Amino acid sequence: MSEDLYEDDQDSQVSSGSRHPMAERFRGYLPVVVDVETGGFNSATDALLEIAAVTIGMDEKGFLFPEHTYFYRVEPFEGANIEAAALEFTGIKLDHPLRMAVSEESALTDIFRGVRKALKANGCKRAILVGHNSSFDLGFLNAAVARNDIKRNPFHPFSSFDTATLAGLAYGQTVLARACQSADIDFDGREAHSARYDTEKTAELFCGIVNRWKEMGGWRDFND
């Protein structure tokens, strides 16, 4: 499926006359930062264990900022594979009494509800996933959507913004912790590999790169 064909199918969601600054900035797409923690690398077979999403806002001067965070610990789907090495890497304890995990469907339904609210507020037609090595997060998101037969997915199915690539361009760093350090963003390695922490830091990094580009004259909004 070509991107143009996909976008044509979505055009009816937003008036062609919409001039909201966020919609203008990203061609009708709203950046939403997503991070997942999983039981392995295979989105079809391995468990989704945590998911977090941060919606992005824009101030009156056209600068981006992290707006609202959604975070869920997720129950592994029936028959899901969970590698011991993955649990050791993330530090997730599935039997922790305070884990309070919810189903994939419940987590995605609530996140998608919040994303659709943000889409409406910003005059955007579709969310675009922002992630650090974004294809990984998008793959697990799409797999969970398909597994739960969720019909209304606000995210573009294959396009994304990858902060590993953007940080490589802006700072010469592709590892999240090092990119944040180069961008003067505090990063605590002890908190890393929590979906919530990584998502919030990725959101700061993304906003910082986009805002820095604007300050350098690389983006002029329609009021300039």
UniProtKB/Swiss-Prot annotation:
The record marks F41, F89, F136, F158 as: Important for substrate binding and specificity. Its EC number is 3.1.13.-. GO terms for molecular function: 3'-5' exonuclease activity; magnesium ion binding; nucleic acid binding; RNA exonuclease activity, producing 5'-phosphomonoesters. Binds two Mg(2+) per subunit. The active form of the enzyme binds two Mg(2+) ions in its active site. The first Mg(2+) forms only one salt bridge with the protein. HAMAP family: RNase_T. Trims short 3' overhangs of a variety of RNA species, leaving a one or two nucleotide 3' overhang. Responsible for the end-turnover of tRNA: specifically removes the terminal AMP residue from uncharged tRNA (tRNA-C-C-A). Also appears to be involved in tRNA biosynthesis. This is Ribonuclease T. The lineage of its organism: Bacteria, Pseudomonadati, Pseudomonadota, Gammaproteobacteria, Pseudomonadales. The gene is rnt.
